[in-house]
Amino acid sequence: MAWRQLRKRALDAAIILGGGGLLFTSYLTATGDDHFYAEYLMPALQRLLDPESAHRLAVRVISLGLLPRATFQDSNMLEVRVLGHKFRNPVGIAAGFDKHGEAVDGLYKLGFGFVEVGSVTPQPQEGNPRPRVFRLPEDQAVINRYGFNSHGLSAVEHRLRARQQKQTQLTTDGLPLGINLGKNKTSVDAAADYVEGVRILGPLADYLVVNVSSPNTAGLRSLQGKTELRRLLSKVLQERDALKGPQKPAVLVKIAPDLTAQDKEDIASVARELGIDGLIITNTTVSRPVGLQGALRSETGGLSGKPLRDLSTQTIREMYALTQGTIPIIGVGGVSSGQDALEKIQAGASLVQLYTALTFLGPPVVARVKRELEALLKERGFNTVTDAIGVDHRR
């Protein structure tokens, strides 16, 4: 048995190193090979590496530019204008993948229409003890309890400032940058942490995200309460408005899927009252839907991936209705196909994000979502993504 396991690991390594070399020189220089990644390379990586090590390797490979530029050409049909910017396509990488701003340019090369860095906390912090990430391959899902591990504002500012001129051009070309802000675990004044994030990283962002919905920092989700949220966002908006320069970042709030009806009404009310620029819906869920098969399904943390998809989409639908479609929404949670993306768009999202799908399907999933989304838009008689936004509410 030991010999068989050793031989299997050696074979996995050969696939990753040898197959990866072939991949770099041929497959991805064309259109990417969905089957090769989903059936061979990604499973081999998962057998060889624990989830966090695989994540770190992926960030490293992408940051070094080792993956060739995706060749899928975004059509005008996929372009969206929202949050004061043009988005070449509506598919972004969600916060949590590039926590420290190390792989922004490599992620654009994969075909994402926008990149969201973070969450970033004011001071560096380690997050929760390992292991803190768990795969549920049977469910196409992941549970994480990272706990806002972050290099801190100073380190991320240094990295992003070094490429600021490049980002200015990318944004002009329809590839905006978002930065997701968090609070330190030991901070007493949460608002002060977010305000500091706005002050330091605001000048480098096209949009900022106030993340008050991670389930892995004690007390964080309580900031979604009406009084606490109004107080926090008032200070964040005041700091944003005080930033120098003509182009100030949009401010969005990322909310949880595990909210009561009253919670949702309160968030919608505060967002409209204060003029929040957008909502990101949703973060991971602490619930465990019936039917999960993964052996690690009972691990503590936030669940992402396919089991989150419908809960996320329903929350988008409800928040779009509560805000009467006046506040742009970025939909995230279980997106791995064009159908998933379109369902969120028709429910009210202007843009979508993915992350967990990369774990199981690899980089070709980006082109797959865009290709399938474009085909579905044509099939259903939409001329653009914008035409499909919130259409479920007009039927």
From Swiss-Prot:
Binding, substrate: K99, N144, R145, Y146, G147, F148, N211, V212, S213, S214, P215, N216, N283, T284
PTM field: The uncleaved transit peptide is required for mitochondrial targeting and proper membrane integration.
Residues reported in the UniProt entry to bind FMN: A95, G96, F97, D98, K99, S119, N180, N211, K254, T282, G305, G334, Y355, T356
GO MF entry, a single one: dihydroorotate dehydrogenase activity
Superkingdom classification of source: Eukaryota
Pfam families reported in the protein's UniProt record: DHO_dh
Active site location: S214 (nucleophile)
Presequence extent in this chain: 1-10
Pathway: Pyrimidine metabolism; UMP biosynthesis via de novo pathway; orotate from (S)-dihydroorotate (quinone route): step 1/1
Topology within the bilayer: Single-pass membrane protein
Catalyzed reactions: (S)-dihydroorotate + a quinone = orotate + a quinol
InterPro entries tied to this protein: Aldolase_TIM (IPR013785), DHO_dehydrogenase (IPR050074), Dihydroorotate_DH_2 (IPR005719), Dihydroorotate_DH_cat (IPR005720), Dihydroorotate_DH_CS (IPR001295)
Residues in compartment: Mitochondrial intermembrane: 31-395
Textual note on the cofactor: Binds 1 FMN per subunit.
SUPFAM superfamilies linked: FMN-linked oxidoreductases (SSF51395)
Cofactor(s) it depends on: FMN
PROSITE patterns (UniProt xref): DHODEHASE_1 (PS00911), DHODEHASE_2 (PS00912)
GO cellular component term of the entry, any: nucleoplasm
Transmembrane region(s): 11-30
Stretches assigned to the Mitochondrial matrix side: 1-10
Subunit architecture: Monomer.
Family: Belongs to the dihydroorotate dehydrogenase family. Type 2 subfamily.
Record protein name field: Dihydroorotate dehydrogenase (quinone), mitochondrial
Organism listed in the record: Mus musculus
